Swiss-Prot record:
GO terms for biological process: mitochondria-nucleus signaling pathway; protein processing involved in protein targeting to mitochondrion. Zn(2+) binds at residues 78, 82, 159. Keywords: Hydrolase, Membrane, Metal-binding, Metalloprotease, Mitochondrion, Mitochondrion inner membrane, Oxidoreductase, Protease, Zinc. This is Mitochondrial-processing peptidase subunit beta. Binds 1 zinc ion per subunit. Its cofactor is Zn(2+). The gene is mppB. Gene3D superfamilies: Metalloenzyme, LuxS/M16 peptidase-like. Disruption phenotype: Disruption of the mppB is lethal. The active site is at residue 81.
Amino acid sequence: MSNITKLFVKSTKNFSRSFSRKTVDPSYLKISPETKITTLSNGIRVATEQTYGEVASVGVWVDSGSVYETDKNNGVAHFLEHMIFKGTAKRPTPQSIETEIENMGGSLNAFTSREHSAYYMKVLKDNVPNAVDILSDILQNSKFETSLIEQERDTILSENDYIQSKEDEVVFDQLHAAAFQGSALGRTILGPVENIKSITREQIQEFINENYTGDRLVISAAGAVNHEQLVEQVKEKFANVKMSQVSKDVKRAAITNDFIGSELRVRDDEQPLIHFAVAVRALPWTDPDYFVLELIQTMIGNWNRGIAAGKNIASNLGEIVATEDLAESYSTFFTCYQDTGLFGNYGVCQPERVDDLVAEMLKEWQRIATSCNKNEVERNKQKLLATTLMQYDGTSKVCEGIGRQILTLGRRLSPFEVYTRINEITVADVQRVASTLLRDVSPAVTAIGPIANYPDYNFVKGWTYWNRL
């Protein structure tokens, strides 16, 4: 063996050892803020993590989104989000709500997803009671005036036009429509245009009555907040919220979301680039291998021409895409739901490169399932740990994390548990999960743009179990 070879082998061994050590001492994570949870008599769960400071975030997280709609009222959850800020008897106009929040230096935000809705505020600690009062008022006493509903239609229609102009939004909506055909997850969050134009006050109120029940509400807070005081405030302000007569589990059991391998393409030769996604059925929130698939997502990575690293990036697929000039960008996504999920790649490329790009993506899936190594697994575990543990920093992120995890898992994951579960992932775990989910499967495929060169579906499916030469 030459001296150069000996030096290379020695360097490789040192490199391997550097990743085999624990680079983070997790003991400090055991002293993270305690999550206190109290369940009220009407089913509302109040959860807090108290830290020192002057600021607190408090929010209401609702186990209700577009998945609980029908074809007839699809879009009502999102419409409700818009209307919730339009006035109550106590705060009769949108301006009165905004002024009150601004006068106490706070902020109010909301979102609607396929499974959840959320309304949350960030305020100084002395204003937490005011925040609870505002949230309880808008969620229970909104007037939903017909004139304001008519005005808001135009706003939502404009929002829909904007979304339809964003290729990534269109691709992911089409991906859901293809993967979950004829099911609740296949619908869009905004709903079809005809529904936006026709949703009524009665439909909005009915949706609240059916879905905004105590057993489906989590009120979470983080930062400078006292748990016992918040519990008393919620007891008072949300006393009129009732338990559901039909449990959420019974309602959800009636909703089927079977994954269907399929394709949905929209050809538009006037567009300069192809936007596409290829995805497989993934894991739900509660699956024990959740963090393994998160790690696989990290390993496959993301890339775009604007990143500073250029071609010098850690991701194997990213290096190939950059070196061979295959794409303008690509990303890896893992979207979780209660009983299923989507995992895959989204890509943007020139029409003549799409065949090679799709092939390399699926080749990378197979490589991870069969021959990924310890060094890349350990390196990406550190990256995943960093991005995941950052979600435990900052009152807004912590408040959101508490609400989401209690809705999806029924409990709060501590930073120490997250660290332990990620740190214990092995190469064998990665290969096992990748082999199960990413090999020899029928994917869902969507593409828009000049797609004449997009590979035939049978080729895409075939590339999940054999490599193109």
